[in-house]
Amino acid sequence: MNSLTAKVNTFDINLSSDFKMSSNHLKLLELDKLFSGIKLSENFKNNFINNLDNENKHNIDFKNYVGLSYQNSKYKISLSFTDRIYTSYNLKKDFFEFVFFGNSRSISDTLNLNNSYFSALKYQQIKFGFSHSFKNYQVGYKIGYLIGNNLINSNIENATLYTSQNITNILMDYNVSSTYSNEFSSSFFRRNGNGISVDLNFLKKTKSKAYKIQILDFGFVKWLDNNNNYSDSNFVYSGIEITDDINISDTNFLSSTNLDKFNSESNTYSFLPTQISFVIDSESKIQFIRSNKIGFNFLWYPTKFYEKISDIKFKDGMYKNGFAPQIYTESIIDLNYFLFSPILSYGGFSDNLNIGTKLTFGKSNSFCIGSYNLESLLQQSESNNVSIYLQLKLSL
């Protein structure tokens, strides 16, 4: 069967699980030590900071999916349920300097924490979709209802920390906003918010190629009134005689200060990470290669929360989220007993070239297992990226 020709009159059941962890700085060995609970050595902290970039990015995306679909020659309808955990950050090198050493190594110097963020989001999504096929075109959309479970968001617009030579003056000039949902739970359907999402796709077919544009998960969650919102700015600590260097992370120091925080009881909106894709799928002239694909992925993800939905600006989702435009290629090779799909990608949250593969067993009923980061098997604890993909498809 032509790889670009869809089946008709089929009812499919899809089950999938997709886990991706990507970083441009954090290795698995370092991650294990950071969360092991053991005391970090000075040597570890120094080596960790010396290997950092100016911008340090990390992302975890874990999705479990169940979908039903019916398709004939004219249209396709679908119903699906997704549970998703999405965390990401983009932090300056000085942020980790501050966390590990406080201000003890920045006397007469300024630490710069500008344009940093941390975000963690968990939600469920129920989608209904419909697509219509014309002669050489296919147009589709999906409408989703969102159940917001948990949200943690901290956004640093501007932040500097200056410590004077004799440590009698500490100047913190910053603009920080944070929010978190009041009740945390890992259980399904813990409703701390509600929202909607939209998917759009457009497909154009020619004799040997298909061109596809997709917008996935454009939407937002309105969190319930029990969210805790905080903002703060501009703090000066001065006029006290100090006889020894102060570590700003010392709990006694922090407890003796009084930072003004402003609690907001207004609405809280957060947006989903929205994927925008452009894909060209071409038939292969080589007998055992079904098709070759090249694609471009972009991420629109505002890293802060909003009190009004009208406050959002398109540029908010294009910068600071740490995702670089990604290009990838994928081929489908028929080896009789299974399909072998090598994948090459560059961009995203990683600065490296990533090598992946998918293995698909079966035809109408199939099982697929794959990874976007086979290099992690060779690098093991030194790897920055880990991923695994599982899919079970049943056609009736």
Regions found by a protein language model. Give the residues of each.
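A subset of solvent-exposed loop/turn segments in beta-rich extracellular surface proteins, enriched
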Residues: 4-188, 224-256, 309-317, 367-372, ...
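Transmembrane beta-strands of outer-membrane beta-barrel proteins
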Residues: 9-17, 75-79, 137-143, 198, ...
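Transmembrane beta-strands of outer-membrane beta-barrel pores
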Residues: 17-23, 81-87, 145-151, 197, ...
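Transmembrane beta-strand segments that form the barrel wall of outer-membrane beta-barrel proteins
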Residues: 49-53, 187, 290-317, 331-350, ...
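Short sequence motifs at beta-strands and strand-loop junctions characteristic
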Residues: 52-60, 116-122, 188-194, 268-274, ...
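Membrane-embedded beta-strand positions in outer-membrane beta-barrel channels/transporters
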Residues: 63-67, 125-129, 197-201, 277-279, ...
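Residue-level signature of outer-membrane beta-barrel architecture
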Residues: 69-72, 81, 132-134, 202-206, ...
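Outer-membrane beta-barrel "beta-signal"
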Residues: 384-396
